[in-house]
Amino acid sequence: MDSVRIVAEGYNCFETDHAPVGTVRYLPDPKAVIALIQSGQLKQHILLAEGGTTTFLAPALSLGAIGVITLSGAPESHLGILSREFQIPCIMTAYLGDSATRYVTGSDNREHFAAVTAALSGKRVRLNCRDSDTGRIELVE
């Protein structure tokens, strides 16, 4: 049996018992999204993107992405709305439980983005979206 620990939390876009497990893949731009789709490995990855206005993830959502994590944004953002429409678990404005860095609107958030990306990229995680407000990112070891 896998051991699980909560590594990060954020805003939950919608409540669901569906808890996808996959390897986190940071997608900084449309080229990275296209490359992942063309690799045939889309359904093995939880997608990590910078913001809730990241519309270039739309092709991945329509082709069967299993889960999304963002570093900023809110459930009311474009990506939050799309995740609900496609019923793809999505946790937004993720922050690490063991770090003081947080996203702050209007601030330079590069340190926060780098910390979360470094901690999650390449890790096998489960998205727990059972709570209506808070989504939990669980490290699966």
Segments predicted by a language model, with ranges:
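Non-catalytic, soluble scaffold/interaction modules
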Residues: 1-72, 76-141
